């Protein structure tokens, strides 16, 4: 893999200098980098890249950072004994705050 990267850089350097100077060289070097990076990461299907949509990434970050309003508990995936213990503690806390627990 490293050999193919070095070989690609070398051919870009020689081909770029022979056909049009530094600007052509830089254009050749950097125009294919995203495609090569995606293919080396296994993100291509032969017809283009998969999952490289920046809007989807931004939406994922926004959804992951949403925080529920104060006083509203998020849905829990716990079950069984853990859920029962959580409910008991939550109910005891509410009763304590409401002042319905007698000492």
UniProtKB/Swiss-Prot annotation:
Domain of life from the UniProt record: Viruses
Pfam families: Microvir_H
Main localization (coarse): virion
GO cellular component: viral capsid
GO biological process: symbiont entry into host cell
Location in or out of the cell: Virion
Record keywords, A-Z: Capsid protein, Viral genome ejection through host cell envelope, Viral penetration into host cytoplasm, Virion, Virus entry into host cell
Keyword Translocase: no
Role noted for this protein: Minor spike component of the viral shell. Involved in the ejection of the phage DNA in the host and is injected with the DNA in the periplasmic space of the host. Involved in the determination of the phage host-range.
Subunit structure: The virion is composed of 60 copies each of the F, G, and J proteins, and 12 copies of the H protein. There are 12 spikes which are each composed of 5 G and one H proteins.
Protein name: Minor spike protein
């Amino acid at each position: 893999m490293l050999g193919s990267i070095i070989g690609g850089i070398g051919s870009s350097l020689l081909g770029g200098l022979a056909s049009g100077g530094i600007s052509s060289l830089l254009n050749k070097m950097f125009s294919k980098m995203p495609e090569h990076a995606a293919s080396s990461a296994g993100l291509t299907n032969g017809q283009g890249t998969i999952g490289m949509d920046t809007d989807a990434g931004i939406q994922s970050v926004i959804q992951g950072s949403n925080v529920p309003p104060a006083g509203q508990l998020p849905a829990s995936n716990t079950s069984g004994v853990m859920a029962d213990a959580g409910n008991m503690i939550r109910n005891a806390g509410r009763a304590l705050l409401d002042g319905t627990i007698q000492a």
